A protein has these predicted regions:
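Mobile "lid/hinge" segments at catalytic clefts and subdomain interfaces of large enzymes
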Residues: 197-351, 443-461, 493-607, 805-810, ...
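Acidic/polar, glycine-rich intrinsically disordered N-terminal extensions of enzymes
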Residues: 1-82, 618-619, 626, 630, ...
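Segments forming glycine/polar-rich beta-alpha architectures that bind adenosine-containing cofactors
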Residues: 624-700
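Extracellular/luminal Protease-associated
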Residues: 288-295, 531, 752-753, 757-797
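Acidic, glycine-rich flexible loop/linker segments
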Residues: 574-589, 801-874
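Long, structured ligand/cofactor-binding scaffold of large enzymes
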Residues: 54-257, 264-269, 373-376, 390, ...
Length: 891
């Protein structure tokens, strides 16, 4: 629907002989006042509001609020934002399509047309989360892993093939193609989007939300995008605006340029550490300053990618000549490139050396020349460690873990016996869109491999090594540069095009290695070029996980240990028994640039010409056409969820929660991995026992992430991470709790089901940063299905808070300095939440009454983190999807 355009700012633009219509920010400024120094990211929001003005969801005073932001640098204004498109990966995409399919069933039951459930915005789903590193270290590894992937995921892929034909505006990028964020960066992202409206072509900024927290990678291209839960993304697909507060924007001024030998990975780990320390949760970060002139777009994308790790909603880079050069490099359409430049300049969104610095809420500064070679670990991405300090950092981990320094064990590998010690690198993975989208660090890794082999070095035999790039272009350019053979010889053979180790799909370790780790309680390491290293994520047996650049991943595979100072100690010895140091095999910038210069646009155009076609495996999947899906009750992967069974009944008004029990008591930094793990399913876990009852053998369990289309598996997997610690059981790891008042120890799932049978509502209590990590909607869905009415925490990560509200679960925040410890909560109390009613307001204070086991009573206040009026509506309806579905049924 055309905008009301109350500011009369619609104008036209001629580019290469074609006329485009757009909503002009300079014209709007004639009534709003000078907005030239508004952060570019907020200019994108302002254009969105101008284009969607309807006097219902978007009003003229919304524009004024953004203009006033220039004076106040902050705002309490809620706006309704409509992104141009939605991006999904298959772990989050399958449950979203399951929900849409179940909504069609609900609409059909209500006597309406199921075609009412269709994406209104373009949706791209990239299958990248399912491939595992089952085979490695051989030329056959890729084909073998593809075969195994297709066998494991046949039910899921058949369902997605059905969805591809059943839903409009819905495209699927088949498995074995790449990682969604890299495909988005190299192909899907347009920077400026166009659509036909009443016979005219409208141009506007390319914007998106994605069902993966690292959607922010596209910010490096000047495209505003961030991760949301699958729940919120589904609502956006169906025409619901994204409700948000106008954010604070933190400016990060970059000066200087990176020194010789310093990589984009070193830079992003430094940025992550700085911004986490400053505190940017729920805020935009925008990069500016003369340092951008020396920062390639691939480096910008790496920084944008890790916005979830530094806590920001996004990490945005404005469009400039570097953007245009990248669009040309990746083979984009010349007319689109011309439009991007002309539109950005016409809108005052173009950056160059003459651009005035924007006004920000606060500003940080980083001199790029001060960045040092770094890793991050062993448990958090923000814990940066200088390369020379990693050995000391690991020894500190040993000391705090109470381990003996010299523990080791003999391990037979490939016919030889080796000593496996604390700190041994058992996984070295060149993985993840974060770094494999960056030709500079990929070429550097290949050059390190080449130089290492020339000096006679080999990969340590206990290291499981792998190469899993985010697009097929990567293997093309490594091959063209003549570097593939060297990576292969060191065991970094191609294992797949997908997320693999970065998301926990590292596959099994060799039996002898696993046995040695388990029998001797060894703390061993993984080194990966990924973006997350939370406990239990990479591999359940690997407790120390280090994020590093691809060339450093190769170096640690050579050294075989993280108990090393690579600045001073050799990686190994050559055939003359001379020490070989990292500096001896590290490539110069000139060598890297020479290799990168071989990349051209035709490589990208060729690979992306048939990106939606898939291989013979994909094309051979048979599907039955139809508007509604024929559910298979015997499927262990895809089941009709229970979320919409009561949609025919009016929602009950909010009411107080009476005499709830505490299901679990957690500490700080409980991640969505802790709440809803994506990796291995333990045979003895509730989910494992359920699958075995269906006749699924443990070797065929696949992963939690692959089974998100089956609510029975996922609710059993909620709070089932093997590294989660419920304080009700002291320091014990695993998804267990104490049932109250019996005090009986049992799995969290079994306790929740017992409480449901007893008619007892539940709450979860936690510390700071609850729900950090992936945009995992099942972390909220599973919480809901366990019967949890509220989560009370000291603070919430942005996406998970939104997801909880979207599933009808209260997110309640302790006030002031209060927390579970200051209030003496132990887990055996009864909690009642007072103040819930039909007239609940955003960010209202509620009262929690506490009844202790000895009968004593007290109370404390909490801040209800229903943050916006839209969220109030969603909560009253029982959740955002219930709200949208009722609207669609009612027409």
């Amino acid at each position: 629907m055309p905008s009301l355009d109350s500011l009369n700012c619609r104008r036209s633009l001629e580019v290469n002989g074609k006329t485009y219509h757009y909503y002009s920010l300079p014209e709007a400024a004639k009534q709003l006042g000078d907005i030239s120094r508004l952060p570019t990211s907020l200019k994108v929001l302002l254009e969105n509001l101008l284009r969607w003005e309807d006097n219902v969801t978007v009003r003229a005073d919304d524009f004024s609020s953004l203009a006033v932001w220039l004076k106040t640098h902050t705002s309490e204004r809620e706006i309704q934002y409509r992104p141009a498109r939605v991006l999904m990966q298959d772990f989050t995409g399958v449950p979203a399509v399951v929900d849409l399919t179940a909504m069609r069933d609900a609409v059909s039951r209500a006597g309406a047309d199921p075609q009412r459930i269709n994406p209104l915005s373009p949706v791209d789903l990239v299958i990248d989360h399912s491939v595992m590193v089952d085979r490695f270290g051989s030329d056959q590894a890729f084909e073998q892993n593809v075969e195994i992937e297709m066998q494991r995921n046949g039910e899921r892929y058949e369902f997605l093939r059905w969805g591809q034909q059943a839903f409009d505006n819905f495209r699927v990028v088949p498995p074995g193609t790449g990682i969604c964020h890299q495909v988005n960066l190299e192909y899907l992202g347009q920077v400026v989007w166009t659509k036909e409206e009443n016979g005219e072509t409208i141009a506007y900024p390319d914007t998106l939300v994605g069902t993966d927290s690292h959607t922010t990678m596209i910010n490096g291209l000047g495209v505003l995008g961030w991760g949301v839960g699958g729940i919120e993304a589904e609502a956006a697909m169906l025409g619901q605006p994204v409700s948000m507060l106008i954010p604070e924007v933190i400016g990060m001024r970059l000066t200087g340029k990176l020194n010789e030998g310093v990589t984009a990975t070193d830079l992003v780990l430094t940025v992550t550490q700085m911004l986490r320390k400053h505190g940017v949760v729920g805020k935009f970060v925008e990069f500016f300053g003369p340092g951008l002139d020396h920062l390639p777009l691939a480096d910008r994308a790496t920084i944008g990618n890790m916005a979830p790790e530094y806590g920001a909603t996004c990490g945005f880079f404005p469009v400039d000549q570097v953007t245009i050069d990248y669009l040309r490099l990746t083979g984009r359409d010349p007319d689109r490139i011309a439009l991007v430049e002309a539109y950005s300049k016409a809108q005052g969104m173009w950056r160059d050396s003459q651009s005035p610095d924007p006004v920000f809420t606060a500003t940080l500064e980083l001199d790029l020349s001060q960045v040092q070679p770094s890793l991050a670990g062993p448990k958090r991405p923000q814990d940066r460690v200088s390369l020379g300090d990693i050995g000391a950092s690991f020894d500190l981990l040993l000391d705090t873990s109470g381990k003996t320094q010299q523990a080791d064990t003999a391990v037979p590998v490939a016919g030889e016996t080796f000593k496996l010690k604390h700190g041994a690198v058992v996984i070295a993975a060149i993985t993840s869109c974060t770094n494999t989208s960056n030709p500079n660090v990929l070429m550097a890794a290949g050059l390190v491999a080449k130089k290492a082999l020339e000096r006679g070095l080999k990969r340590a035999p206990w290291v499981k090594s792998s190469l899993a790039p985010g697009s097929k272009v990567v293997t093309d350019y490594l091959e063209r540069a003549g570097l593939t053979t060297y990576l292969d010889q060191l065991g970094f053979n191609l294992v797949g095009y997908g997320c693999t180790t970065c998301i926990g799909n590292s596959g099994p370790l060799p039996d002898a290695i696993s046995q040695a780790i388990t029998d001797n309680d060894l703390i061993v390491s993984s080194v990966l070029s990924g973006n997350r290293n939370f406990e239990g994520r990479v591999h359940p047996l690997v407790k120390a996980n280090w994020l590093a650049s691809p060339p450093l991943v190769v170096a640690f595979a050579l050294a075989g240990t993280t108990r090393i100072n690579m600045d001073k100690e050799p990686l190994g010895y050559d055939e003359q028994n001379q020490p070989v140091y990292l500096k001896d095999i590290w490539p110069s910038s000139a060598e890297v640039n020479e290799a990168v210069s071989r990349i051209d646009g035709q490589m990208f155009r060729t690979r992306y010409a048939d990106v939606f076609s898939g291989d013979q495996h994909w094309q051979s999947i048979a599907v039955t056409a139809g508007d509604t899906y024929k559910w298979n009750n015997n499927s262990s992967y895809v089941q009709n969820p229970p979320f919409f069974e009561d949609i025919g009944q009016p929602p009950a008004p909010p009411k107080d929660v009476e005499n709830a029990r505490i299901l679990a008591l957690f500490g700080d930094s409980i991640t969505t991995d802790h709440i809803s793990p994506a990796g291995n399913i333990k045979a003895s876990s509730p989910a494992g026992l359920y699958l075995q009852q269906l006749g699924v053998q443990p070797e065929d369990f696949n992963s939690y992430g692959s089974r998100r289309g089956n609510h029975e598996v996922m609710m059993r997997g909620t709070f089932a991470n093997i590294r989660i610690k419920n304080e009700m059981l002291g320091g014990e790891e695993g998804g267990y709790t104490l049932h109250q008042p019996s005090g009986e120890r049992m799995s969290i799932y079994d306790a929740a089901m017992r409480y449901q049978a007893e008619g007892v509502p539940l709450v979860v209590v936690a510390g700071k940063e609850y729900g950090t990590g992936s945009s995992r909607d099942w972390a909220a869905k599973g919480t809901n299905l366990l019967g949890v009415k509220a989560v009370i925490a000291e603070s919430f990560e942005r996406i998970h808070r939104s997801n909880l509200i979207g599933m009808g679960v209260l997110a309640l925040q302790f006030v002031g300095d209060q927390n579970r410890q200051s209030l003496g909560l132990t887990g055996n109390e009864k909690l009642s939440i007072r103040g819930l009613s039909a007239d609940i307001k955003p960010r209202q204070l509620l009262t929690v009454d506490v009844e202790r086991a000895d009968g004593t009573r007290e109370n404390f206040q909490v801040l209800c983190r229903i943050d916006t009026l839209n969220e109030v509506q969603y909560f009253k309806a029982g959740g955002i999807l219930h709200y949208v579905l009722r609207q669609l049924i009612e027409g």
